[in-house]
Structure formats: structure tokens, C-alpha cells
Amino acid sequence: MKKLAFLILLIVFSNLSLVNAIDDNISNYSKEINELTVKLKELESKNPNDERIEEYKEKLKQLIEKQHELKSQNLKYNETLAYIQSEEYWKMQEEIWEYNNKVMKWFIAISILILGIILATLWILRKDKFLLFLAIFGLIVPFLQFKIPNWLFNILALPLFVYIKFIVPECAEGSFYYSPLITIPISMYGWILIGLAVKFIIKKY
């Protein structure tokens, strides 16, 4: 039993050593191919009629063939190649393409809808210069984030600051919460609400 276990371990380690040796050789061939390709391009640019060009091309061809032969001995490479050539892989690629296409259509539709709402709001506010100014200001502010100091941006982008501080979850970095489709309308309508609050206070007192 011990001998059998030892034999199995020996076979496993032998296979691992063989795979590592193949990977090292593939890496060496890749390095040689890259170096030879650079030399060939330099030679072709300097002297297209140089006799060494054909010699380099032949050597490059041989190196690529040897590299491919080694790759075919690598089980991982064969498995990957078989998977890429399988119907399952191409079906998955088709599903990914369809999903991306659907997402893009929804993104365009929502973008047009939000743009329409923003333009309609600006049209409604056209007679109230104060609110119109705040609305346009709210539209511009998000684009100033990396052009002004952070403390100043937090003041100018007060609605966004409140939104990020109290609404956006702490673990939402890089998520749709920070999408311009959300932050720009929040900034604009936030400043409109601030303007309405100011007008209400002035009117009341």
C-alpha cells in the first residue's frame, strides 16, 4: 500500500515537473520569437533587400512551429483549445453579446429619457432666472470634480455630497450609484430644491 501511494506521488510529481518544463520551454520560445521579430522588423525597415531577412523568416517559422508543438503537449493548453472550439463556448459568447447589446440599448434609452427630462425642466424654468441659473450650475458642478480642490467641490456639489454621505452604501465603490445618469440629475434637481427653499424662506420672512 505504501509502495502504491509512493508510486502515485512519484507519477504526479513527474507530470508536474514535465508540465513546468514544457511551460518554461514555451516561455523561452516566446522570448526568442519576440526578439527575432524585432530584429526582422528593424532589418526590413533599414534594408528590405538584405539576404538575412529570408533566413530570419525561416528561423521564425521554425520557432513558432516548435512552440506550437510544445503547447500541444501541455494538457491545460489542449483543454483550453478544446473548450474554445466547443459549441458551449460559442453559445456562451453569443449570450454575452446579446446581453451586452440589450444593456447598451437600455442605456441609450434611459440616457435619452433623462436628457429629455432635463431639457424639459430647463424649458419650464426659463422664466425664473434664479432657478434656471441654479439648474445649469447643478449640471456643470459634477464635471468640476477633478479640476478644483476637494473641499470646494464638496461645497459646490452639496446635493451630491448629501447623496453620497447618506444614501450611497459604503461598499458601493465604482457601482451604478456613481453613474453620471444618476449624479448629474441629482446635482441639478438638488440645486433646484435648494433654490425653491431659499425662495420660500425669503417669501415667508
From Swiss-Prot:
What's the protein's topology in the membrane?
Multi-pass membrane protein
For whether the record's keyword set contains Metal-binding, the answer is no
What are the boundaries of the signal sequence?
Answer: none
Q: Name one GO cellular component term.
A: plasma membrane
- In its UniProt entry, the species of origin is given as Methanocaldococcus jannaschii (strain ATCC 43067 / DSM 2661 / JAL-1 / JCM 10045 / NBRC 100440) (Methanococcus jannaschii)
* Coiled-coil blocks: none
Protein name stated in the entry: Uncharacterized protein MJ0585
Location relative to the cell: Cell membrane
Sorted UniProt keywords: Cell membrane, Membrane, Transmembrane, Transmembrane helix
Domain of life of the organism in this record?
Archaea
Q: Does the keyword field hold Chloroplast?
A: no
Listed transmembrane segments: 4-24, 105-125, 130-150, 151-171, 182-202
